[in-house]
């Protein structure tokens, strides 16, 4: 199901993450999107982003994300959300993360909005 409004991307991402739907999570990213999971680390394109999300989904955790803002200019939108994640590693250790994300989304020719840039945790978030 295509996301036809940028302010619905966060909600759709949360729903898909909750059921570990990797294929439809990937559909929320442009083919040449950039995901920057840590300072100085950039993952480019579906193959690299898929590998990262696959590892995160293995933690079998719960993601809670609240959208803070969605600023739109034409076919581009800047999204900001506050999120927390709690899961377990393969060894059973508790994994807890959280922060404030910033994402740039773009509307495609098909009318669907997708992430072009995903910064899960801003430096001061």
Which residues fall in each region the model found?
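A solvent-exposed, acidic/Ser-Thr-rich amphipathic alpha-helical stretch
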Residues: 3-9, 22-74, 96
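Generic hydrophobic alpha-helical segments
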Residues: 12-13
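Short beta-strand segments enriched in hydrophobic/aromatic residues
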Residues: 29, 83-85, 119-121
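A short hydrophobic beta-strand element
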Residues: 74-85
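Short, cysteine-centered beta-strand-loop-beta hairpins and adjacent loop/turn segments enriched
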Residues: 86-95
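Short beta-strand edge/turn micro-motifs at domain boundaries
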Residues: 98-125
């Amino acid at each position: 199901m295509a996301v036809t409004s940028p302010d619905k991307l966060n909600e759709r991402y949360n729903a898909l993450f909750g059921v570990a739907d990797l294929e439809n999570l990937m559909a929320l990213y442009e083919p040449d999107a950039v995901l920057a999971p840590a300072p100085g680390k950039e993952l480019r394109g579906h193959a690299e982003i898929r590998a990262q999300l696959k590892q995160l989904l293995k933690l079998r955790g719960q993601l809670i994300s609240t959208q803070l803002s969605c600023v739109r200019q034409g076919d581009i939108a800047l999204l900001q959300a506050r999120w927390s994640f709690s899961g377990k590693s393969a060894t059973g250790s508790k994994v807890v993360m959280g922060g404030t994300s910033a994402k740039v989304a773009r509307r495609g020719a098909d009318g669907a909005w997708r992430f072009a840039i995903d910064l899960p945790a801003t430096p001061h978030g």
